[in-house]
Amino acid sequence: MKMETFLVCLFHNADGLHQQIQEILYLLRMHIYETNLYLKQELSRLIYPNRQLSFVLLMPLSLLRNWDDIEYLTDVVDDKQTLHYAANLLTNYVLHLSMFQKLTKPYFLLAVKRVSEKLNKKQQHSFYEVLVTSETLNNYENLSKNILNTLMFAVRYVFKPTPNYSEILAELEKKNKIHHIIFNMVITDFAQIREQQMDKHLCETNNKLRQECKETIFDLKVVGNV
Protein backbone atom coordinates (compact mmCIF):
# COMPACT_ATOMS: atom_id res chain seq x y z
CA MET A 1 0.00 0.00 0.00
CA LYS A 2 1.36 3.38 -0.99
CA MET A 3 1.65 6.23 1.47
CA GLU A 4 -0.89 8.40 -0.37
CA THR A 5 -3.46 5.63 0.09
CA PHE A 6 -2.78 5.60 3.81
CA LEU A 7 -3.07 9.38 4.06
CA VAL A 8 -6.36 9.37 2.17
CA CYS A 9 -7.68 6.73 4.57
CA LEU A 10 -6.93 9.06 7.47
CA PHE A 11 -8.71 12.00 5.88
CA HIS A 12 -12.42 11.82 6.67
CA ASN A 13 -13.02 14.55 4.07
CA ALA A 14 -10.64 13.12 1.52
CA ASP A 15 -12.60 14.09 -1.60
CA GLY A 16 -10.38 15.90 -4.03
CA LEU A 17 -7.21 15.43 -2.00
CA HIS A 18 -5.88 12.27 -3.60
CA GLN A 19 -4.22 14.01 -6.54
CA GLN A 20 -2.74 16.64 -4.25
CA ILE A 21 -1.21 14.00 -2.04
CA GLN A 22 0.22 12.18 -5.03
CA GLU A 23 1.85 15.38 -6.26
CA ILE A 24 3.25 16.12 -2.81
CA LEU A 25 4.74 12.65 -2.60
CA TYR A 26 6.23 13.04 -6.05
CA LEU A 27 7.97 16.20 -4.90
CA LEU A 28 9.21 14.40 -1.81
CA ARG A 29 10.65 11.61 -3.95
CA MET A 30 12.46 14.22 -6.02
CA HIS A 31 14.01 16.00 -3.03
CA ILE A 32 17.50 14.78 -3.88
CA TYR A 33 17.30 16.30 -7.36
CA GLU A 34 15.62 19.66 -6.84
CA THR A 35 16.33 22.75 -4.75
CA ASN A 36 14.73 23.57 -1.45
CA LEU A 37 13.20 26.77 -2.84
CA TYR A 38 11.54 24.95 -5.72
CA LEU A 39 10.05 22.37 -3.38
CA LYS A 40 8.74 24.99 -1.02
CA GLN A 41 7.08 26.94 -3.82
CA GLU A 42 5.47 23.85 -5.27
CA LEU A 43 4.27 22.59 -1.91
CA SER A 44 2.82 26.00 -1.09
CA ARG A 45 0.90 25.94 -4.35
CA LEU A 46 -0.45 22.45 -3.70
CA ILE A 47 -1.27 22.77 -0.03
CA TYR A 48 -2.40 26.36 0.45
CA PRO A 49 -6.15 25.71 -0.09
CA ASN A 50 -6.26 23.17 2.73
CA ARG A 51 -5.33 24.47 6.17
CA GLN A 52 -4.98 21.04 7.74
CA LEU A 53 -2.50 19.96 5.10
CA SER A 54 -0.72 23.29 5.46
CA PHE A 55 -0.19 22.71 9.16
CA VAL A 56 1.19 19.21 8.89
CA LEU A 57 3.31 19.69 5.78
CA LEU A 58 4.68 23.24 5.83
CA MET A 59 6.62 23.76 9.06
CA PRO A 60 9.56 26.18 8.96
CA LEU A 61 12.75 24.45 7.91
CA SER A 62 14.75 26.14 10.66
CA LEU A 63 12.79 24.32 13.35
CA LEU A 64 14.63 21.11 12.55
CA ARG A 65 18.15 22.50 12.52
CA ASN A 66 19.03 21.09 15.92
CA TRP A 67 17.27 17.75 15.72
CA ASP A 68 20.03 15.17 16.14
CA ASP A 69 18.06 12.40 14.47
CA ILE A 70 18.40 14.15 11.13
CA GLU A 71 22.06 13.15 11.13
CA TYR A 72 20.87 9.60 10.60
CA LEU A 73 20.34 10.39 6.94
CA THR A 74 23.58 12.27 6.29
CA ASP A 75 25.20 9.39 4.46
CA VAL A 76 22.27 9.24 2.02
CA VAL A 77 21.90 12.89 1.01
CA ASP A 78 24.99 15.10 0.85
CA ASP A 79 23.29 18.48 0.59
CA LYS A 80 22.45 19.58 4.14
CA GLN A 81 19.74 22.02 3.12
CA THR A 82 17.97 19.39 1.08
CA LEU A 83 18.43 16.89 3.88
CA HIS A 84 16.77 19.14 6.43
CA TYR A 85 13.90 19.89 4.11
CA ALA A 86 13.30 16.22 3.41
CA ALA A 87 13.40 15.47 7.12
CA ASN A 88 10.96 18.31 7.66
CA LEU A 89 8.48 16.71 5.28
CA LEU A 90 8.93 13.30 6.87
CA THR A 91 8.39 14.78 10.32
CA ASN A 92 5.12 16.29 9.25
CA TYR A 93 3.93 13.01 7.77
CA VAL A 94 4.59 11.55 11.20
CA LEU A 95 2.55 14.27 12.84
CA HIS A 96 -0.26 13.64 10.43
CA LEU A 97 -0.21 9.90 11.05
CA SER A 98 -0.17 10.28 14.82
CA MET A 99 -2.53 13.20 15.26
CA PHE A 100 -5.14 13.32 12.54
CA GLN A 101 -7.58 10.94 14.17
CA LYS A 102 -8.14 13.55 16.88
CA LEU A 103 -7.90 16.66 14.74
CA THR A 104 -11.67 16.77 14.26
CA LYS A 105 -12.22 17.37 17.98
CA PRO A 106 -12.35 21.07 18.91
CA TYR A 107 -10.10 20.74 21.97
CA PHE A 108 -7.39 19.16 19.86
CA LEU A 109 -7.67 21.75 17.11
CA LEU A 110 -7.05 24.38 19.78
CA ALA A 111 -3.91 22.56 20.89
CA VAL A 112 -2.71 22.40 17.30
CA LYS A 113 -3.26 26.13 16.92
CA ARG A 114 -1.25 26.83 20.06
CA VAL A 115 1.61 24.66 18.90
CA SER A 116 1.55 26.37 15.52
CA GLU A 117 1.84 29.76 17.23
CA LYS A 118 4.78 28.53 19.28
CA LEU A 119 6.47 27.24 16.15
CA ASN A 120 6.22 30.67 14.55
CA LYS A 121 7.64 32.42 17.62
CA LYS A 122 10.39 29.98 18.58
CA GLN A 123 12.20 29.25 15.39
CA GLN A 124 15.50 29.01 17.22
CA HIS A 125 14.29 25.82 18.91
CA SER A 126 13.97 22.38 17.41
CA PHE A 127 10.55 21.27 16.24
CA TYR A 128 10.55 18.38 18.70
CA GLU A 129 11.32 20.67 21.62
CA VAL A 130 8.45 23.00 20.77
CA LEU A 131 6.04 20.16 20.14
CA VAL A 132 6.40 18.63 23.59
CA THR A 133 5.85 21.95 25.36
CA SER A 134 2.14 21.53 24.77
CA GLU A 135 0.48 19.59 27.58
CA THR A 136 -2.17 18.26 25.22
CA LEU A 137 0.48 16.82 22.93
CA ASN A 138 2.71 15.30 25.59
CA ASN A 139 1.08 11.91 25.06
CA TYR A 140 2.48 11.94 21.54
CA GLU A 141 6.08 12.62 22.54
CA ASN A 142 7.37 9.07 22.27
CA LEU A 143 5.03 8.14 19.44
CA SER A 144 6.20 10.93 17.16
CA LYS A 145 9.89 10.35 17.80
CA ASN A 146 9.71 6.57 17.47
CA ILE A 147 7.66 6.64 14.29
CA LEU A 148 9.94 9.29 12.82
CA ASN A 149 12.93 7.04 13.45
CA THR A 150 11.15 4.19 11.72
CA LEU A 151 10.19 6.42 8.80
CA MET A 152 13.71 7.74 8.41
CA PHE A 153 15.15 4.27 8.61
CA ALA A 154 12.78 3.09 5.91
CA VAL A 155 13.78 5.90 3.55
CA ARG A 156 17.43 5.26 4.30
CA TYR A 157 16.91 1.60 3.49
CA VAL A 158 15.43 2.45 0.09
CA PHE A 159 18.61 4.24 -0.94
CA LYS A 160 21.05 1.87 0.74
CA PRO A 161 19.37 -1.53 1.10
CA THR A 162 20.80 -4.20 3.34
CA PRO A 163 20.46 -7.96 2.88
CA ASN A 164 18.56 -8.58 6.12
CA TYR A 165 15.21 -7.07 5.07
CA SER A 166 13.20 -10.02 6.41
CA GLU A 167 14.90 -9.80 9.81
CA ILE A 168 14.23 -6.07 10.06
CA LEU A 169 10.60 -6.58 9.10
CA ALA A 170 10.09 -9.34 11.66
CA GLU A 171 11.63 -7.23 14.41
CA LEU A 172 9.44 -4.22 13.61
CA GLU A 173 6.32 -6.36 13.48
CA LYS A 174 7.15 -7.89 16.85
CA LYS A 175 7.83 -4.55 18.52
CA ASN A 176 5.10 -2.33 17.13
CA LYS A 177 2.44 -2.89 14.49
CA ILE A 178 2.27 0.70 13.30
CA HIS A 179 6.04 0.78 12.75
CA HIS A 180 5.72 -2.37 10.68
CA ILE A 181 3.04 -0.79 8.50
CA ILE A 182 4.87 2.50 8.01
CA PHE A 183 8.13 0.81 7.12
CA ASN A 184 6.46 -1.19 4.39
CA MET A 185 4.48 1.74 3.01
CA VAL A 186 7.63 3.83 2.71
CA ILE A 187 9.56 0.99 1.11
CA THR A 188 6.77 0.38 -1.39
CA ASP A 189 6.36 4.04 -2.28
CA PHE A 190 9.94 5.29 -2.33
CA ALA A 191 11.28 2.21 -4.04
CA GLN A 192 10.05 3.65 -7.33
CA ILE A 193 13.23 5.72 -7.30
CA ARG A 194 15.26 2.57 -7.82
CA GLU A 195 12.56 0.38 -9.32
CA GLN A 196 14.90 -1.39 -11.71
CA GLN A 197 17.25 -2.31 -8.89
CA MET A 198 14.63 -3.55 -6.44
CA ASP A 199 15.25 -6.93 -4.96
CA LYS A 200 12.71 -9.56 -6.06
CA HIS A 201 12.11 -10.66 -2.50
CA LEU A 202 11.36 -7.08 -1.46
CA CYS A 203 8.68 -6.74 -4.15
CA GLU A 204 7.06 -10.03 -3.26
CA THR A 205 7.03 -9.21 0.44
CA ASN A 206 5.35 -5.84 -0.13
CA ASN A 207 2.67 -7.38 -2.32
CA LYS A 208 1.80 -9.89 0.39
CA LEU A 209 1.61 -7.15 3.02
CA ARG A 210 -0.75 -4.81 1.18
CA GLN A 211 -3.94 -6.54 2.27
CA GLU A 212 -2.65 -6.90 5.81
CA CYS A 213 -1.86 -3.19 6.00
CA LYS A 214 -5.26 -2.27 4.60
CA GLU A 215 -7.06 -4.33 7.22
CA THR A 216 -4.93 -3.05 10.07
CA ILE A 217 -5.33 0.61 9.15
CA PHE A 218 -9.07 0.47 9.63
CA ASP A 219 -8.56 -1.21 13.01
CA LEU A 220 -6.50 1.70 14.30
CA LYS A 221 -9.03 3.60 16.39
CA VAL A 222 -6.34 5.66 18.09
CA VAL A 223 -2.85 5.40 16.66
CA GLY A 224 -1.31 6.20 20.03
CA ASN A 225 -2.70 3.02 21.54
CA VAL A 226 -1.20 0.72 18.94
From Swiss-Prot:
Keywords, in A-Z order: Glycoprotein, Host-virus interaction, Inhibition of host NF-kappa-B by virus, Signal
Q: Name one GO biological process term.
A: symbiont-mediated suppression of host NF-kappaB cascade
Reported induction: Expressed in the intermediate phase of the viral replicative cycle (immediately after DNA replication).
Q: Signal peptide span per the entry? A: 1-16
Q: What is the top-level taxon of the source organism?
A: Viruses
Disulfide bridge positions per record: none
List all annotated glycosylation positions.
142, 164
Q: What does this protein do?
A: Plays a role in the inhibition of host NF-kappa-B and IRF3 signaling pathways. Mechanistically, promotes the degradation of host IKBKG through enhancing its ubiquitination leading to inhibition of both pathways.
User: In which family does this protein belong, per the annotation?
Assistant: Belongs to the asfivirus I226R family.
Please give the name of this protein: Late protein I226R
Q: Which organism is it from?
A: African swine fever virus (isolate Warthog/Namibia/Wart80/1980)
